[in-house]
């Protein structure tokens, strides 16, 4: 028998049409592998059968299989909650955000295919090997085929089981001696119940921020530090992370102090602060993917030490520390160079000085700034709280389709669903990035983060290219979100000169509350919803006389009130017809007059 | 504990952020404790006014505008590099003054000067009495103002759940200088009276 149990591989029979409880496995007994992973496949259930139910052939008999059983229950418990109705099983995944993505039932049916799978398991494959060979089944097969529960894939379930297993296995806090494990199923079941109550884990949501107000290209290095922070944490705690965006992490762990000390040290070395909301509960109580929903949740804010008073001068970038460096004098002094800059001097603290001193990888943006080109900033933001609420509503709708008597409380969102979503969201970001590269070309695109882009632009017309691109991708990946007036994925586009201080753009983008925001620096803002992206694009294709819009745009520069009077003035019939035409397209979106004028400026370009 | 609410109106207002984008001077989109308390102290010759302010978010008010001007060195008579200044026009906001000895006998309407570029005509504000606020029941929400941490009890801020820290300038009396004191900025998650929170 091999030495290692690969937890992810525990649900082997779900790749086939065989019963999960081995009741029709007898004819393949000769092909059963002799590995520890296979022992996990057989022994990861511990269920005392109810009357009339077929029993599982085995139960956990050692520490490894017992931990696998707990991990499997913890991972599946997130999506496998009881429902009081029966119906036809569905073995393919139903994506709540993308129901039109129909998966085929690709499970292995033929005896020879199943024998091939068993032979593959006999070679003691890794999880990577399994994914390489059977990924098509893993992503299409629902983890749970019961009606209304087929919302997560087997792949997601396997990944989560692996994560939980390793955290339990290497924990110094969760104790399980071999002597505690008895040989009968009843005692094994009792032990499961006891450990699920006894073992308490922490669920935490961390949000990273920075105090810097970046205004030069090199100040954007702080965004690299943000990226490095999340990636360092990911490397250090690969099994603990359940969800991650560019500045947020949802994770679980057993020892708060040890984990927080490490994260604090990473954040501090990257000049970031963070807030953490966490709760410690027994395994059996942790179900929702939000620590705030658990009893006893607490919030901590991990800032670097802040003095009560700072004597002038204060740092001009972060405004959080005494300035003891002068830019660029002190920077040049490091290289024994005399100052050659024609720009003014700035008082910076040590941290901001170090960030600015780092060479910037944004070389194209630097060139565009020197040439004073126009740029488009594009930020894609995922609102986690909105995401959980949206998924809950979509799940409720789905349950009701299967069973009109389903209750709202049945539609609980579990980690597996969030993890399932994360995989599609990451694929979506990658696709957006690739398509931006195709549409604008490498020379005009700077990828600042995986959800923040800077594009050299020739004019406002590129904003429409971006809108078309979003419309297309939202339709492919998350069509259900397009029906919402306030969805969890937010697009922020800002047009400005490359020289325009980034912190002004960042302030707008990071505080974005609507799901589609278009900022034309110095010219106005459009706030609307992705739901109306079609209408917005349709409105651009209307036939309007340019002169009518030119008049309105020019008047608005003097007085927006006067422009509004002109907009509603029927005395100039020809202009009024154009305005009415535009109103018909834009007013249903709830756009105010300021938004309409901004839109006119967009069209004027 | 009670507060007096005044409405604030101005044609144009520039309350500068300390950071500057080289030749760009941004402005704050709120009225910090330091600015409004200082303006009231100057107006009425006192030193113990405690007040904060917020700007209305209705789209017709507080429009962002830009002014380009070239400051001139009076000694040499030479103009410096032109600066682009961000300012607010058609300003409308509300000011909440803590009721204490300093706030006794405030007029129904008065004029104060707030922010920078006063010599260019910015910052002339009209304060008009609106109402007295006695309901200061705290609730959880997102803070909409900037005030020094030491003044949190004055404004009945009971708990700071998720702070956004920053520093506000505090002048040293009878000098032309001052210090920066640790403060709570807009965006903090707090338990505070409703009028201090975002709607």
Model regions: which residues?
Chain A
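Regulatory and interdomain segments flanking nucleotide-handling catalytic cores
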Residues: 1-605
């Amino acid at each position: 028998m091999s030495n290692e149990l690969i937890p992810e591989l525990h649900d082997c029979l779900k790749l086939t049409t065989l019963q999960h409880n081995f009741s029709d496995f007898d004819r393949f007994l000769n092909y059963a592998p002799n590995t520890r992973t296979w022992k996990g496949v057989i022994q990861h259930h511990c269920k005392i059968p109810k009357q009339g139910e077929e029993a599982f052939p085995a139960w956990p008999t050692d520490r490894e299989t017992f931990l696998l059983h707990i991990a499997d229950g913890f991972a599946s418990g997130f999506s496998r909650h009881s429902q009081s109705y029966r119906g036809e099983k569905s073995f393919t995944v139903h994506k709540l955000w993308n129901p039109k993505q129909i998966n085929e039932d690709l499970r292995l049916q033929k005896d020879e295919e199943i024998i091939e799978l068993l032979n593959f398991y006999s070679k003691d494959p890794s999880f990577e090997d399994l994914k390489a060979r059977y990924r098509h089944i893993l992503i299409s097969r629902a983890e749970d085929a019961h009606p209304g529960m087929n919302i997560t894939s087997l792949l997601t379930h396997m990944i989560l089981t692996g994560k939980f297993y390793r955290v339990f296995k290497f924990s110094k806090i969760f104790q399980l001696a071999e002597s505690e494990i008895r040989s009968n199923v009843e005692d094994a079941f009792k032990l499961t119940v006891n450990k699920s109550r006894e073992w308490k884990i922490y669920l935490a949501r961390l949000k990273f921020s920075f105090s810097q107000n970046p205004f030069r290209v090199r100040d954007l290095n702080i965004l690299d530090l943000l990226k490095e922070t999340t990636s360092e944490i990911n490397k250090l705690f690969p099994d603990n992370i359940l969800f991650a965006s560019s500045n947020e992490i949802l994770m679980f762990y057993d020892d708060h102090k040890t984990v927080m000390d490490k994260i604090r040290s990473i954040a501090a070395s990257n000049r970031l602060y963070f807030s953490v909301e966490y709760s410690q509960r027994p395994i059996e109580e942790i179900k929702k993917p939000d620590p705030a929903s658990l009893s006893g949740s607490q919030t901590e804010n991990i800032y670097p030490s802040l003095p009560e008073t700072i004597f002038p001068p204060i740092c001009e970038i972060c405004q959080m520390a005494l300035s003891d460096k002068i830019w660029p004098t002190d920077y040049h002094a490091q290289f024994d160079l005399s100052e050659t800059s024609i720009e003014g001097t700035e008082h910076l603290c040590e941290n901001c000085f170090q960030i600015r001193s780092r060479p910037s990888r944004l070389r194209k943006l630097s060139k565009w700034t020197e040439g004073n080109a126009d740029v488009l900033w594009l930020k894609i933001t995922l609102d986690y709280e909105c995401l959980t609420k949206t998924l809950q509503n979509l799940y409720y709708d789905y349950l009701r389709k299967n069973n009109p008597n389903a209750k709202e409380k049945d539609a609980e969102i579990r980690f597996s669903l969030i993890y399932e979503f994360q995989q599609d969201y990451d694929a979506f970001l990658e696709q957006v990035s690739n398509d931006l590269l195709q549409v604008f070309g490498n020379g005009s695109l700077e990828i600042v983060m995986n959800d923040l882009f800077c594009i050299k632009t020739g004019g406002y017309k590129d904003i429409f290219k971006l809108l078309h691109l979003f419309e297309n991708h939202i339709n492919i990946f998350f069509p259900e979100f397009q029906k919402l007036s306030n969805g969890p994925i937010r697009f922020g586009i800002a047009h400005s000169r490359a020289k325009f201080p980034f912190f002004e753009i960042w302030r707008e983008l990071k505080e974005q509350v609507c799901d589609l925001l278009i900022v034309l620096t110095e010219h106005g803002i459009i706030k609307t919803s992705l739901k109306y992206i079609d209408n917005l694009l349709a409105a651009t294709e209307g036939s309007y006389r340019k002169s009518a819009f030119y008049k309105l745009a020019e008047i608005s520069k003097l007085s927006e009130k006067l422009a509004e009077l002109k907009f509603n003035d029927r005395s100039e019939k020809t202009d009024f017809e154009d305005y009415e035409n535009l109103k018909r397209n834009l007013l249903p979106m709830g756009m105010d007059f300021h938004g309409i004028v901004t839109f006119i400026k967009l069209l004027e370009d | 504990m009670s507060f007096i609410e005044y409405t604030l109106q101005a044609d144009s207002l520039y309350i500068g952020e300390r950071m500057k984008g080289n030749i760009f001077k941004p402005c704050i989109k709120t009225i910090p404790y330091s600015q409004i308390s200082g303006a009231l102290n100057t107006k009425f010759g006192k030193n113990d006014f405690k007040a904060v302010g917020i700007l209305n978010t209705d789209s017709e008010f507080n429009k962002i505008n830009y002014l380009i001007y070239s400051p001139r060195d009076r000694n040499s008579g030479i103009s410096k590099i032109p600066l682009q200044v961000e300012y607010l026009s058609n300003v409308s906001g509300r000011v909440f003054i803590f009721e204490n000895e300093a706030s006794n006998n405030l007029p129904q309407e008065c004029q104060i000067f707030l922010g920078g570029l006063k010599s260019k005509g910015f910052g002339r504000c009209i304060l008009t009495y609106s109402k007295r606020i006695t309901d200061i029941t705290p609730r959880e929400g997102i803070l909409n103002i900037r005030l020094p941490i030491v003044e949190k009890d004055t404004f009945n801020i009971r708990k700071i759940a998720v702070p956004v820290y920053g520093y506000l300038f505090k002048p040293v009396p009878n000098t032309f200088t001052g210090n920066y004191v640790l403060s709570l900025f807009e965006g903090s998650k707090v338990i505070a009276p409703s009028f201090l929170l975002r709607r």
